[in-house]
Amino acid sequence: IYNGAYYVEGTAKDISVSSALTKLDNGKYYYITASGTIFKPSGSGIYKADNGRRYYFYSNGSVEHVTKTGIRKIGKKAYYFNSNSSVKSTGKTHFAKISGKTYRISSKGYLLTGWQKIGKNKYYMSKKSYARIENKTTTVSGHKYWFDKTGKVITSKWKYKNGSRRYYFDKKGRMLTNTSKKIGKYVYFFNKNGVLQRNLISYKGYNWVLSHPLK
């Protein structure tokens, strides 16, 4: 600081704002605290400013500046930004519903992907869109899973389709395919597409006449 000017990376600017972002002569944005000083992070990442918002700061003190709401990837992590450059984060890992889609945001502010276990329930966050998979059957690592409207994996349950096709999802939530399985008192057969087989089938070199209680 010299005569009210702040010097950052060889540039200087008189700063009259506080608790806000400002653009310096080097073209980068910085956060000016309520006391009028430039916020200096201990390293790159999400920090909560004294205006209550969280921003992504680089180690040199500059802020990731955005003008459009949406997901932006920085390095190997993705973040959901508001149009004022703040990051959607509470400082705790949580689900956040944004524009009709649900995301899982970590305590450090980045979007989580893959399997998420909460209590006894499991959810899956898309590695492509980052959103939670809901109300559909989808393939994950070679297995098909059935997700309800809240995104929870459905386990140990029959699924009916088109009034006649039956599928079964085991205790891990995986759809049974190309196998036989004892469910309750009965043994059932499923083809490579997971459809429950009826009547006469060929399985492991033998012909089987199927009779089971499902109607």
Language-model region placement:
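Extracellular adhesion/carbohydrate-binding repeat motifs centered on closely spaced tryptophans
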Residues: 1-215
